[in-house]
Amino acid sequence: MKVIKRSDKVQELDVAKIADSIFLAAQDVGGTDDKLAKKLAKEVIARIDKHYGRIKKVTTAEIGDMVERVLLEKTHYKTAKAYILNREKKRQVEAAKRALGVHDDVGLSLNALLVAKEKYLLRDTDGEARESVGGMFDRVAKFLASCEKPKDRKIWQEKFSKIMKEQRFMPGGRTLANSGSANNQLANCFVMPMPDDIEGIFESLKESSILKKYGGGVGFTFGHIRPKGDSVSTTSGAAAGPVALMQLINDASDIYLQAGKRRSGNMVTLPITHPDIIDFIHCKESGYNYPHINFSVAITNKFIEAVKNNSEWELINPRTGLVTSKVSARGLMEEAARMAWKNGDPGLIFIDEIEKHNPTPNVGRLETVNLCGEQPLLSYEACNLGSVNLSVHVQENHKSQILKFSNGDTEIDYKKLEESVRIGVRMLDDVVSVCTYPLKKVADTVHGNRKIGLGIMGWADMLVKLHVAYDSPKALELASEVMKFVQDIGHDESAKLGKEKGSFPNFKGSRWQKNGYKYFRNATVTTIAPTGTISMMAGASSGIEPHFALAYTRRSMGEFTLPEVNSDLVKAIKHVNGVYSAELMDEIARLGSIRGIATIPEKIREIFVTAMDITPETHVRMLSAFQKYTDNAVSKTINLPAEATVEDVMNVYMMAAELKCKGITVYRDKSRGEQVLNVGKVEKKIEDLCPECKGKLAIEEGCKKCHSCGYSVCG
């Protein structure tokens, strides 16, 4: 028998789902007999067959009514009441969805639907959505498949659409928003040059502004800019230096409000050898304001050795190549650590490690990265990103039992994951082909290398489903195992695409040719990016981050609803007799973490951890485990407790260098407190609040993200 869902999707009638809904309601009132729930579900199925058997279809509302009737007739009054309340909550969510004016034919969460409407759905002249959620995915799939062979387009369109509707893979935000629209600029990130002359500076400013106009963050290196006070021969004056130039870049970014209500962002890096490096490190204390700039110091292996040896470090004028002064290497690193301890900036990129893995050294050097640091790029290069949702690649396995609170054992569905990766690689390669790049120089560079960045999200969700603690040795082992699998399949698929469609034009002389490949479609294949709003669309945790908190306040139609507790955690607690209660849910919502709640079994507390429950060293080791099997870089925040010291930050930096990371960003809890409002005895940090809904911002993957409304600086 077919079931017609509220979203108009059609599914087969499943007795297990009915039994689960009855048992969850029973658990709300202290019930523990899952066998009774299954027996009642069979009674419901029998009555449905009797009443709807001839028409062979039934709606979810009719199923719910039948469950209520059976529970009441069998005198399970408390369970019936809980079931009715649960149905009412679902009705409220459906009403809120309808009020958004968006047809949800896929079955997204309310929060995901809000994100889709605000950022990705095409709108009419009145600003209202003119496509359904499924229509959006169909639009994207059709546009990306348009570059496939005519006889294969329909096949790939259906595969692309299916994988997005099942929330197995999501392309980057610009691809979702712009595919098949008047603005076919689909790339999220670019890198532009910044030469050391006035004409070149303003040409780069103009070109980067054009990119931002069409949607996309831009990375720069200021390593070629002469230092402040250096001579300018044409005017006999003195140079302003890189820090002053940052203000120019920031102000230009203020002009463009990008598609999807995301203001343009920039990454600025400066080599550790630059004479203005100390001013750069302290630039947020210098009176300047850079809300649209992330900035990082480009660290070399030679500098790390100098720090270890506590030796002097030479600062070199990039214009003349001459040493201008010598400073303490350790003192310089401590200054960077002190500022990061104070407000989270600057980050570090390990430029030698980045260049070591440059796939096309014959084409040019990698000098900087994109907005959030996960994508090293050549000048005038862009990268198209997308992420596989790991949380939906877990399946039941009844061979053994791991934890008593689990619903049965689980394992990674590698067959499904392989299919998702292969389709995702092809989708991103098609993005390169169909994207309209605003600058010819960008189009030429991108088509020469055809770089893509397939990554992952939902890592914390996957670990929970596998009953593995994020901060355990097993999690680190799994991280390497999963990412190696994704990388190997991604490389294999790119090689197959190279044979089918041709290798990237700069293949000759590339690392891939030297490694024995005869064909390779993409100069890079894997990247772990900040998943920003696309993880909210997929209902997944961000990238490889742990859960920021186990409860969030969700926004509904401009107002805040009651806090929402992590659904996997609720299920786990309900499977332990006598633990679940509404009061416990309120306590979890208030604390955000369960580490200190003794009434929750220890095994559950070990598995459901948050970012602040995890040591900085474990964060770095997780970053390194994924970086080992990632072509490009990995974006991840290293969270430190409020009581952490500058020396703790130093240790994190040195550990990241030792473990061959390509970049690192730290955030010490409660460190961003430049703007403080005193309201009675309560202090609130403005910088930590979402600019759209005033909810608390999470710092994840080096990027600010709001779990309440979906706001994100990084798509």
What are these regions (language model features)?
Residues 9, 35-144, 148-161:
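Core nucleic-acid recognition elements
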Residues 82-96, 299, 356, 362-367, ...:
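Terminal amphipathic helices with adjacent charged low-complexity linkers/tails
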Residues 96-157, 225, 234-248, 258-358, ...:
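Conserved, charged catalytic cores of large soluble enzymes
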Residues 110, 374-376, 428-433, 503, ...:
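Catalytic alpha/beta core of large soluble enzyme barrels
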Residues 141-149, 153, 161-186, 191-234, ...:
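Function-dense linear segments that define catalytic or interfacial modules
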Residues 205, 320, 420-443, 447, ...:
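Internal maturation/activation junctions in enzymes
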Residues 690-693, 706-709:
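Short cysteine-rich clusters marking metal-coordination/redox-active sites
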Residues 709-715:
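Short Cys/His-rich micro-motifs in 6-15 aa windows
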